[in-house]
């Protein structure tokens, strides 16, 4: 996927690899441990001793009942009703949009229709009570899962696992932003990022549950389609748990806006097992022809992960008899689910919330919807093309329409030991024994030896390795990946730029903590608290040399010029920050912003200029992102100023209002002193210099002053203003380049202070 648009759509989510052995829409389930609490759970108000469950836990606002005489469920659903969404056209819109994005970003689609069918859209009948505003996005997600699933059915084990791993990394970049996840730049990852952004915009907390569910599916199924199952009893639990529960649970709860706690999921898990078995078996039954064709076309596959195939092997029967057995199993599991659900409602209704009951009821519609939709979709009937050529406008139970309606929006003491000369000699050996080994020859006449062994770099690198190991959001890495949507820098050069920026950034962290006398860094002891000030300074200086050497390897005079120029500016900015603190001199707002442009924004400016120098594009096609990186640097620094005073996470990682201990003139403090000069506050700052820190009580007093002058409110307003301006600048750049940057938009969303 070397095209620009493929790279562009990729970066916008640190999300990025959205896969799903969506063996089908309807065979997914969730692990209880992944659900999130979203406030107080509404408990049932049923009367004690109630001898019957409510007829329905769901209020039908968004769907209508389909006349059973107009469809045939083959007797597989035990009489479960079929409902269809009133805005099914939104589901069609989401499916078509996903297919268009795939063709544009990934490649051609063959023999694929996904959720679409001439009569019913799969999501419209599987989740008929989906919140209308979420229907298009949910269908897009399921369509994307189908497309990914089709890849898995046509590749070998290693390629399939890599497809899943790529998708998992995309989820991890959002769910675990502190991890240094290596992002893919494929078109599929761009689609994943785009989708994640849409889901987060609709409902961030519930979207995170869905993303975690999807991640669990991807990780659980990796390589599972290549398992050699010998019996249905062996296959089905694996199919249900690893290829079903996580994804579909996340889809249903997000689509319907349900909040189901971990405890409720544990309690209802035995109830839902036969429901997911029904979905899995039905999917395998209807998708048999499709999967068998793909199986025959893939010589690397030795077995099919399909219930019909396994029944044929287990019982030594032909295809038709295996299908009959499979149908019987579907009916049995469906009836078992209905029995367990009724029993649970009668005996344990008050133990869970209404939303948990709604989830259980929603599964019934997923069962009937899956069975009926599967009979219409050419996904499983591609050998009958007359069923599908174009989606019709239907003003019946399918409710298809052109009206869009709703937009989707180191080392212990050592000892010298004499050994024979054939033992390798080294001056430092950090072995587990803590013993340094030297030869007799070395002990006798080292002063005359001019070709002594090279010294290890372990000591000089130890502080760097320590600070690198601390938790980090890897914002700079994500920013580089996002910008590369526009610059298209080759991967080898891009990695060297990342390495150089990492080395500079970590050097600045070590020196900053010394200069600010900060004992904590990201909730851990600062580097100089472990290795001492002198060793830390030396290690930081070494990093500057290492970064220069890395830039040299880019073999570009322009890159060297950029590196030296921006490094000078970075040190100038830091010198001003230190000068104001040391002399208790409050800068003007203009001086503060310019300092930020030099210091914090310097690395972002360096990144953009280095990427511009190494871009294979002509200079007129390389976008000017200087305004964007300047604004981003300001937003990043002001956000840090604000969070240092207001965020519990910052308090846990660095200490309570650590900027006040350091005497740093942050934006809130500058605003306070500028708008309402205060002798008491100025005296506090001078005393801080004398004492080296502030007491807890004094910090509270400073915060009171900041509140009185509305300086914290002002800082938040500046953040909001910058956030809006950043999006406008992003709009301009996307228009100029013709490439959307979803990864950069996702990064801005992650950094947004609410």
Curated annotation (Swiss-Prot):
Record keyword Cell membrane present: no
Residues reported in the UniProt entry to bind Mg(2+) 2: 149, 153
Classification via InterPro entries: Isoprenoid_synthase_dom_sf, Polyprenyl_synt, Polyprenyl_synt_CS
Cofactor note (record): Binds 4 Mg(2+) ions per subunit.
Enzyme class: lyase
Cofactor(s) in the UniProt record: Mg(2+)
Gene3D superfamilies in the cross-refs: Farnesyl Diphosphate Synthase
Keywords: Isoprene biosynthesis, Lyase, Magnesium, Metal-binding, Multifunctional enzyme, Signal, Transferase
Gene Ontology molecular functions: lyase activity; metal ion binding; prenyltransferase activity
Binding residue positions for Mg(2+) 4: 512, 516
Region (Geranylfarnesyl diphosphate synthase): 389-753
Composition-biased stretches (Basic and acidic residues): 392-403
Catalytic activity, as annotated: (2E,6E,10E,14E)-geranylfarnesyl diphosphate = preasperterpenoid A + diphosphate
Any single biological process term in GO: terpenoid biosynthetic process
Protein's pathway: Secondary metabolite biosynthesis; terpenoid biosynthesis
One Pfam family, short name: Terpene_syn_C_2
Family: In the N-terminal section; belongs to the terpene synthase family. In the C-terminal section; belongs to the FPP/GGPP synthase family.
Protein's job: Bifunctional sesterterpene synthase; part of the gene cluster that mediates the biosynthesis of the asperterpenoids, sesterterpenes that exhibit anti-tuberculosis activity. The first step of the pathway is performed by the sesterterpene synthase astC that possesses both prenyl transferase and terpene cyclase activity, converting isopentenyl diphosphate and dimethylallyl diphosphate into geranylfarnesyl diphosphate (GFPP) and further converting GFPP into preasperterpenoid A, respectively.
The protein's name in its UniProt record: Bifunctional sesterterpene synthase astC
Lineage: Eukaryota, Fungi, Dikarya, Ascomycota, Pezizomycotina
Gene: astC
